[in-house]
Amino acid sequence: MPSSDQNPAATPASGTAEPAPPGRPTAVSSQVLDMGAQLVQALKPVRQMKQHACSFALDAHDLRRQLEVHHLVSRLNQDVLQCAVYDSDEPSARLIGVEYIVSDTIFESLPPEEKRLWHSHAYEVKAGLRTDVGVREALQSSETARLSKTYGKFWCTWQVDRGDQLPLSAPALMVSPQATEPGRVCAELVRGRDERYRVDSSAGGLKADRVEMDEPEWINPNADYWLHGMGFAVDVVPCFFFLGR
């Protein structure tokens, strides 16, 4: 199996221009089951997703690979968020990964080798890249101020940017955009998002609204580890499984 920094072997589900996954149209019987289950099942974890945030993410081993990402956010408590990450907010959106977000206090309690898998959010927030879609800035300002002092760990399980129609190969670690190259997000990518959602993340828009926002006293140097000149890729290797009790 290839690592996350390699393309998978050619399959009918890799490297295509067609975004839809392979498969037959949903059968009527399956649709009926879905409708019936919706009436009787609580789906409690799903109903805890209260926010839709849009931002951007970069591949930790190749910062040229950049994605617009859509987080459906649920709050475990004030210091821990968990996010299902999609490639759009359309009904046909693909679940491409998961991000966990923790406060700076929790992050500082992690061992150094674990910290290296996490990224800071200060620049992403203050630059207006992250926004709660459709929510007025005045309403989301307290939340964005808190988020600027958080750290995230984002695993991408479906690398749609290379044309994969299914989740192939190992998951990829993702990082947040930063102010310095090569970690700056593509301006065209941001412009497309802004136009679609009528967001102004320019110097006269969200950036100006957030310029007075308190910044973290410091950003732990073990986060955003690519700034040290090192990325991370995931290898899947065979091993003997444990048969003990």
Model-derived features with residue positions:
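An exposed acidic His-Trp-rich patch
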Residues: 89-185
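Extracytoplasmic c-type cytochrome modules immediately beyond a signal peptide or single-pass transmembrane anchor
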Residues: 43-103, 107-108, 116-123, 127-128
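N-terminal domain-onset segments
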Residues: 1-80, 143-245
